[in-house]
Curated annotation (Swiss-Prot):
Classification via SUPFAM superfamilies: P-loop containing nucleoside triphosphate hydrolases
InterPro entries, per database record: G_ENGB_dom (IPR030393), GTP-bd (IPR006073), GTP-bd_ribosome_bio_YsxC (IPR019987), P-loop_NTPase (IPR027417)
Protein name listed in UniProt: Probable GTP-binding protein EngB
Gene Ontology biological process terms in this record: division septum assembly
Origin: domain of life: Bacteria
Amino-acid positions noted as binding GTP in the UniProt annotation, renumbered to this chain: 45-52, 72-76, 92-95, 159-162, 193-195
PANTHER family associated with the record: ENGB-TYPE G DOMAIN-CONTAINING PROTEIN (PTHR11649:SF13), MSS1/TRME-RELATED GTP-BINDING PROTEIN (PTHR11649)
Amino acids binding Mg(2+): S52, T74
An annotated GO cellular component: cytosol
Cofactor: Mg(2+)
Taxonomic lineage from the root: Bacteria, Pseudomonadati, Pseudomonadota, Alphaproteobacteria, Hyphomicrobiales
Gene: engB
Pfam family, one: MMR_HSR1
NCBIfam families given in the database record: GTPase_YsxC
Length: 217
């Protein structure tokens, strides 16, 4: 499947992520964020949806972001910086909806997530990851509502496509599109990915190459 990205963009995306990516900063709170710089792209989503794994798949570096089978792995806003000439950062976010953590911690993560999404001018795009097996839940809607209020452009990425049959995937994608009609600030189109197989990863890289191109103009 192609998601509309042409060969030139796919190549630009490939080059962007073939460059050197490294960890630069971890913020446990809104007060400790790095100074705003360049183009920032954040990955949000429920705990365990595959945010950190997708960052690893994009950068081709299997251990850049810490992943875990247990929800609640990423507990801070983690910043990764791309090649110097690109001036781009990826932000791995803590997951939301992690029910078995202490209440105070859930509240503090949730507040950090919403504050970051509302108040970060250098944030150029947020990818909201949704598990292909589950689709959009109420807890995701809260994030979409926050994003509707912020000026940042955002897009839904269905993850773990390898876990779902093709027919079910098509239904889930369609249902997700239908739900998005209620969120005019969202990209109407939905990306489908698997960090395990690499499905959809070149298209996501291409989308980011396009975004950076738009910001450098
Ligand atoms: N089958 C399959 N499993 C995946 C995929 N991506 C991630 N996983 C698994 O899902 C689990 C969670 O992955 P993470 O990348 O740590 O998820 P996260 O969203 O960063 O989780 P938190 O940091 O806890 O919010 C791990 O066991 C991964 O191996 C995928 O594309 N396919
Ligand atoms: Mg994580």
């Amino acid at each position: 499947m192609t998601t509309g990205a042409d060969a030139d963009l796919i190549e630009r995306g490939r080059k962007l992520f073939a460059g050197d990516w490294q960890f630069i900063w971890a913020s446990p709170s809104i007060e400790t964020l790095p100074p705003m710089a360049g183009v920032e792209v954040a990955f949000a989503g429920r705990s365990n949806v595959g945010k950190s794994s997708l960052i690893n798949a994009l950068t081709g570096r299997g251990t850049l972001a810490r992943t875990s089978r247990t929800p609640g792995r990423t507990q801070e806003l983690i910043f990764f910086e791309g090649p110097k000439d690109a001036d781009v950062r990826l932000v791995d976010m803590p997951g939301y909806g992690f029910a078995s953590a202490p209440k105070a911690r859930i509240a503090s993560w949730t507040s950090l997530i919403h504050k970051f999404l509302l108040g970060r001018a250098s944030l150029a795009r947020v990818y909201v990851l949704i598990d292909s097996r589950h689709g959009i839940k109420d807890i995701d809607q809260a994030i979409l509502t926050t994003l509707d209020r912020s000026a940042v452009s955002y897009q839904i990425v269905l993850t773990k496509a390898d876990e779902v049959k093709a027919t079910e995937m098509a239904e889930r994608t369609e249902a997700t599109r239908t739900l998005l009609a209620k969120h005019p600030a969202a990209f109407p189109d939905v990306l489908v990915t698997s960090s395990r197989t690499g499905y959809g990863v070149p298209e996501l890289r291409a989308a980011m190459a396009r975004l950076i191109g738009e910001h450098q103009r």
